Amino acid sequence: DCLYLNIWSPRDHSSFNAEKLPVMVWIHGGGNTIGTANTYDASLLAGSEQVVVVTINYRLGFFGWMSHPALRTPDRNALDASGNYANLDMIAALQWVSDNIANFGGDQNSVTIFGESAGGRNVFSLMASPLAKGLFHRAIAQSGSVGTAPRWRAENFHDDTQPGQALSSREWLSLQLKNSGRAKDSKAARAAQMLMSDEETRDFMYSRSPQEILEGVSGGAGMYSAPQSFRDGTVLPQDTLYTVFSDPSRYNSVPLITGTNRDEAKLFLAQDPEFVELRFGFLPRVKDLQAYNELSAYLTDSWKAMAVDGIADIIAANSSEPVFAYRWDWDEGGKSWLIDYSELLGAAHGLEVAYIFGGFDGAIGAPGLYTDNNIAGRDLLGQQMRSYWSEFASTGAPGNGRSGVLPQWRPWSNAGANLMLLDTASGGGLRMVNEPMTVAMLKERIAQDPNIPELRSRCALHVQLFLLANAGDDVWDEADYDALGCAEFNPWGLEVER
């Protein structure tokens, strides 16, 4: 019972006004397994920028995505068989907005979808979905990713020749059979489910309570790595999004803003005891700052290479619709003898969201991150970002912002500065730069990095960046992997080891 949405409309704008306002539909993040629209207060964004903001909920994790042969038998319709139930929730929300938003002063012909992290991933998926055609007119992906999953990755056992994810539907079903007492161990559960008919499998799945469905599933901050965004051929194309976005006739080609944060990975590394220890049980300290920064740079740069430069290059080369790219660089978190947030987090994943919505109290953070010393810079940067975002929602280009006084944000091109850096004056301010990051550059860096002494470690990093993270298998090239000297290591075997 989660399919609700929230609407913020400027107080001084009546639904009876002849001029309707741009609409911004927010898709929350959380790995597509946690989170809620109710976390986000869009009153400042709506009121200060004169836009109507809608925040939506959708089914999460196994409830939102479940791909299994028993769920797509011939008697099932294509939507039920897709397994992409959460994507369908988002499309239903957009249809509701199209049908009803005029009653709240919004223009159904000027709808911008925007989301962060998993929400950004969902933005890219909606761009690719033929079922979302005409329901939105602009898109913003904040720290998104373009990864989609083939059926085998979502369904196979983890040790199959084509290995499924650790929580593929068959692995999850084995867990359910063990938890219910119908199998004593994984081997017995595997044998049992292979003997079950499609009807028996469905009946068993449907009999499990929400609590039972999640029993034994764990992950950081409540998140877990469930398969999602399946290439089903109905809700999402059967090709990778890199392939789809190469042809504007195959997706919802609209103006796009895409960007990442300069230190994305530090949010996750900061919670990993391999890299960060807790003094007195609560004060984090980076164990090896050089190693911490180097791994963060690899993970973060691969994110930018795939979700910003890679996507922008493909769309700019093939579509007449503009792409605008950014990198968010704010790293002025509080510093004391106890903790230095500029080192621990820097410009970490998710921190930019508070600047869009304008509230820092409930933002990702920790005591001492936001201080009186950095409040003036934070507030101004937030105003500037909201101005750019709302101008894009209004016109399809961030330009000089809604205020008309900001540095011009130019579209992506292969010549000159094409990336907007978003930072306070003490960090250099708002400015256009040319700082490319490509998959080829990263592969060469791994090959030449003197700080990776072991071949196996080099190969494992290659697998982590180009097979498992962000873009899924969009950029995987077996020949490149072999050329690195990794042919002796099964890449999926390296995944299992981690």
Walk through the language-model features, giving the residues of each.
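The conserved beta1-alpha1 loop
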Residues: 8, 27-29, 97, 143
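Substrate-access "cap/lid" subdomains that shape
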Residues: 92, 99, 103, 124-128, ...
